[in-house]
Amino acid sequence: MSPLHVVILAAGQGSRMKSSLPKVLHPVAGKAMLHHVVDTAKQLGAEKIHTVIGHGADQVRASLEDDSVNWVLQTEQLGTGHAVAQALPALPDDARVLVLYGDVPLTRKDTLETMVADLDERNLALLTVDMDNPHGYGRIVRNEQGLVQAIVEQKDATAEQQQIQEVNTGILAVSASHLKQWLPALSNSNAQGEYYLTDIIAMAVDHGLSVTVSQPLNPFEVQGVNNRLQLAELERWYQRQQAERLMTEGASLADPARIEVRGELTIGNDLWIDVNAVFEGRVSLGNNVVIGPNCVIKDATIADGAEIKANSVIEGAVVGANAQIGPFARLRPGTELAANTKIGNFVETKKAVVGEGSKINHLSYVGDASLGRNVNVGAGTITCNYDGVNKHQTVLGDGVFVGSNTSLVAPVNVAEQATIGAGSTITRDISKGELAVARGKQRNIAGWERPKKA
């Protein structure tokens, strides 16, 4: 089969977005619309992806460093036909060419695979959709036998043609050799003075090609974004699809309308996810995991039976089986928690490896640290890991007990079963089983009186 090349049109200004950010870089599910389209093209096995850029070209190019993308500059925006023509020099004559759009981010791979499955020199493949309100879209004109004859844009359509409810999505596929023959012959003699890519449909019919039509499972797959309202509508549809998938796969959601999946979320069975949970990047949740309300979890692995309580933020961390996190805890990148650990309220960890059964229950910061098994860290404990230039390591052995309001000035090594008295500032290593107390001596002054106002 001839190679597949994908041309993505991403040169438009997007003035209705009212934004300095190029339209195709506005996010859906936490990822730029254009990046969704590029990822789909990769999943199709495209030999090369040609992305036509114009407005904000430097910004768009800088957003995606990818060797599989060939950037094509359209200096003047003269219509979709003109945009595709800019990519012609990079298209091999024997290639099959699929045209996608940078502001139509959620077309499914399966939909496109079906569309191009039988594409060859003898046909042109078209993706259409039926709409109750087709205003603004190009209409699919068929003959009495039901065969596609042309696409007529809204501004050029007759009153009769405007009653047609089957509309053009803009997505089509055809051989590169045909594109190289037809695109130079396009005319801009139309209501908008543009070179319409859709005019090649009539050319294909005139040259005896058959026009094969397929449709997506859901119209939202091919919904484009021209303003922030449409962006929000697309986001809600996507999130509803994610919620339905999660419930099908074994999660119970407190409210399917109040969950955000902005990446790849994989789950086990019998999960509970409360309202306003946000999942970003690659997140894996094991069996029987509980996610409390208002949690944000990014690029993390949560093992079986773990409970993430309300208002906790986890990023770049591994949480072991049956661990308890929060409420109001923050696990930063590099945190690795073993099974049965507990990270309580207002605790922050960073590059901290915490052994099985260890607890950091309240109001503490543990960074650049290694904790053994069954360590107890009292409230208000701080690892002083930064000297203004470098970060230093704190090591607590198995069974260490750290009293409340302790400062551990790194680098410092506390051996197993050692105990640190509350209120201590530890600057030296502590040997196995020792008690360390490092605080000012208490003085009680008899007969002292509080100052009085003059």
From Swiss-Prot:
Query: Pathway it acts in?
Result: Nucleotide-sugar biosynthesis; UDP-N-acetyl-alpha-D-glucosamine biosynthesis; N-acetyl-alpha-D-glucosamine 1-phosphate from alpha-D-glucosamine 6-phosphate (route II): step 2/2; Nucleotide-sugar biosynthesis; UDP-N-acetyl-alpha-D-glucosamine biosynthesis; UDP-N-acetyl-alpha-D-glucosamine from N-acetyl-alpha-D-glucosamine 1-phosphate: step 1/1; Bacterial outer membrane biogenesis; LPS lipid A biosynthesis
Residues that coordinate or bind acetyl-CoA: 379, 385-386, 404, 422, 439
Could you list this entry's UniProt keywords, alphabetically sorted: Acyltransferase, Cell shape, Cell wall biogenesis/degradation, Cytoplasm, Magnesium, Metal-binding, Multifunctional enzyme, Nucleotidyltransferase, Peptidoglycan synthesis, Repeat, Transferase
Where does the UniProt entry say this protein principally localizes?
cytoplasm
Q: What is its EC number?
A: 2.7.7.23, 2.3.1.157
Active-site residues annotated for this sequence: 362 (proton acceptor)
Reaction(s) catalysed by this chain, per the record, are:
alpha-D-glucosamine 1-phosphate + acetyl-CoA = N-acetyl-alpha-D-glucosamine 1-phosphate + CoA + H(+); N-acetyl-alpha-D-glucosamine 1-phosphate + UTP + H(+) = UDP-N-acetyl-alpha-D-glucosamine + diphosphate
GO function terms (MF aspect): glucosamine-1-phosphate N-acetyltransferase activity; magnesium ion binding; UDP-N-acetylglucosamine diphosphorylase activity
Q: Its domain of life?
A: Bacteria
Which InterPro entries is this protein grouped with? Bifunctional_GlmU, GlmU-like, GlmU_C_LbH, Hexapep, Hexapep_transf_CS, MobA-like_NTP_Trfase, Nucleotide-diphossugar_trans, Trimer_LpxA-like_sf
Chain positions covered by the region annotation Linker: 229-249
Q: How is the cofactor bound?
A: Binds 1 Mg(2+) ion per subunit.
Binding-site positions, Mg(2+): 103, 226
One of the protein's GO biological processes = lipid A biosynthetic process
**What does this protein need as cofactor?**
Mg(2+)
Where does the record say this protein resides?
Answer: Cytoplasm
Annotated region Pyrophosphorylase: the residues are 1-228
A GO cellular component entry from the record = membrane
* Entry annotated with the keyword Iron: no
Function comment? Catalyzes the last two sequential reactions in the de novo biosynthetic pathway for UDP-N-acetylglucosamine (UDP-GlcNAc). The C-terminal domain catalyzes the transfer of acetyl group from acetyl coenzyme A to glucosamine-1-phosphate (GlcN-1-P) to produce N-acetylglucosamine-1-phosphate (GlcNAc-1-P), which is converted into UDP-GlcNAc by the transfer of uridine 5-monophosphate (from uridine 5-triphosphate), a reaction catalyzed by the N-terminal domain.
Q: How does it assemble?
A: Homotrimer.
The protein depicted here goes by the name Bifunctional protein GlmU
From what organism does this protein derive?
Marinobacter nauticus (strain ATCC 700491 / DSM 11845 / VT8)
- Provide the taxonomic classification: Bacteria, Pseudomonadati, Pseudomonadota, Gammaproteobacteria, Pseudomonadales
- By which gene is this protein encoded? glmU
